[in-house]
Amino acid sequence: MKRLFALVALVATLVGCAGNSEKVAESPAFDKYNSVVYELNIRQATEEGTFAAAEAYLPVLKDMGVDIVWLMPISPIGVDGRKGTLGSYYSIIDYKAINPEFGTMEDFDKFLATAHDLGLKVIIDWVANHTSRDANWWKEGKKDWYVMDEATGLPIVEYDWTDIAKLDYKNEDMRAAMLDALKFWIEKGVDGYRCDVAMNVPGDFWKRAWEEVRAINPDVYLLAEGEETWLHDSDFDATYAWELHHIFNAMAKGGSETKNVAGDGTIKTDAKSVQDLKDYIARDDEKYPAPAMRLMFTSNHDENSWAGTEMERMGDAHKTFAALTFVLPKGQPLIYTGQEIGLNRRLQFFEKDSVVELVDTEYGKEYRDFYKALCAFRH
């Protein structure tokens, strides 16, 4: 452990000169710039897969040093074209409702209240790009709210997501309904959003949405899945550091093929070195000036289920790269469900699974202590 932190400190010193030295004003209510994010997969975090069961785990996350709990989508899942038995969290019927698989709205409210009592912030995953193919909006006859396939008379399918229907942001009524739904959860006390495939939604929509959301809560935390620079111009606080993630994978494996989860196929990543990492940091600093934050990770729900665990992709170096996500300039570290107990298998995505087999083991405790030390180092 000491040798690991010595390496991290050395790398942080070496790359620190490339980091933007501008100090960001901290909110007295919520220091988002120094926060650690935990992605909570409600379905798989416990045997029950419910808000009530996950609520009992919140004190553990607080003790570990987590600041922001990101909930994967919590809305009801479509049946038309459903993948697997339980379906994809990202195929949504109703933006203002709770997936009964996880519990009731009252269960969610209690989960949120407990998190807030512990000093944790809660953000929810928001899917503004598309709905399920049997969403309420579609059933209500709002055909003009969707991008249509003229050949089939049905909404288009993007990538291989055959269970979704693409929304049309040229329609002002649809925009208004989406904005109303975003404000609904902020008014309930949710602290922000992680926005799925945010780069596929027009920037002018995001900018207006965040103006209205921040009028309700100025301290919301807004994370975009994507690393297009214009997302920061659209008032997102943080974007994904995908390029860095692929550099980590390539450094660990000496060059590998990495699946692009956004659907653009398989890309070849050449072998990378520490110099490539330093070059990236300097380039990233220029491309994303402060106060932009970059979400850094060794795993997330996409990587774990489709590309493999951090142990698969990074081998024995996975802890070193995890440590780097906590110290690199402008980085916002992410911990995904199961990482904090050393889970070394892919979680099922469309079926019930669980990470509980390692929770109470010495092996699991070792990883929890590791991440607790990283969180303390960060703070």
Model-predicted regions and their roles:
Residues 25, 112, 196-290, 294, ...:
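Active-site-proximal helices and loops of the catalytic beta/alpha 8
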Residues 2-8:
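Sec-dependent signal peptide recognition
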Residues 70-84, 125-134, 196-202, 225-229, ...:
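Short, solvent-exposed turn/loop segments enriched in Gly/Ser/Thr/Pro and often Arg
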Residues 50-53, 103-107, 173-177, 201, ...:
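Soluble or luminal CAZymes and related metallo-dependent hydrolases
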Residues 21-67, 73-188, 208-217, 221:
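Substrate-binding/active-site clefts of carbohydrate-active enzymes
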Residues 288-313:
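Active-site clefts of carbohydrate-active enzymes
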Residues 36-40, 69-71, 122-124, 193, ...:
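Hydrophobic faces of well-ordered beta-strands that scaffold small-molecule active sites
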